Amino acid sequence: MHYALRNRTSTGLKLSHTGFYMETINAFSDEDLKKLVGTIFTENKEKLLKWPAAYKLHHAIRGGLLMHTLSIVKLCEGVCEVYPFVDKDLLLSGAILHDIAKTLEFNVGETGLANGYSVEGNLIGHLVMGAMMVREAADKLGTDKKREMLLEHMILSHHGEPEFGAAVRPLFLEAELLSELDLMDARVYQIHEAITPLKEDDFSGRLWALDNRKIYNHGLADNKKDVDLD
């Protein structure tokens, strides 16, 4: 899969990438999180192959939502190797579900591109709707209330600051890590998209999503390399 996609209607994602999620979920030792995350993911996996992660910003391409969340899951696995005191099942649960309600937030056509926000997307937004999805599934499954609450908090706080849409700031380690990794993946995508068309030593135009910065292509990296999500 290549970030600098010339064809915004194809990411190269396929059903096997949703299978990776189920393998990840089935490896959880926490049975409550395994059932909860597995249920919600299974109900939405067909949409994930098509849905973009944004209307206009990062990963605003067909399958971009799956691409973005899969990137974060991979990053979470690396973080947990370095920091063994992190609750891996909880962090991965938040990574898999943090943007799941974007399947409700956007109106998406056959091309897999968002053509606007749904009524629910405008009035409620994907953070709150995601927490609502967790609560509804948890109630049906009889999920442990503490685990339900922690996962809801991770979804509600993953934008980091209220000015960026967070309902609350991250208040425990796994929530903080999810917020930082979400931001990192979005910015890597945006910067890579900005510099790939540029010649060496050129600057992009000012990018609103990157604090109105102009991004520099130093020319030392191979921007044509694919993102490794397999």
How should these model regions be labeled?
Residues 29-33, 45-49, 142, 163, ...:
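Residue-level signal for secondary-structure boundary elements
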Residues 173-230:
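Acidic, carboxylate-rich catalytic segments that either coordinate divalent cations
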Residues 57, 78-198:
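Divalent metal-dependent catalytic cores for phosphoryl transfer on phosphate-bearing substrates
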Residues 52-55, 61, 65, 69-70, ...:
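Solvent-exposed, flexible loop/coil residues
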Residues 2-121, 161:
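Acidic/His-rich, divalent-metal-binding segments that scaffold phosphate/diphosphate chemistry
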Residues 22-29, 41-45, 52, 155, ...:
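Generic secondary-structure transition motif, activating predominantly at the C-termini of alpha-helices
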Residues 18-26, 34-38, 152, 178, ...:
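Generic detector of well-ordered alpha-helical segments enriched in charged/polar residues
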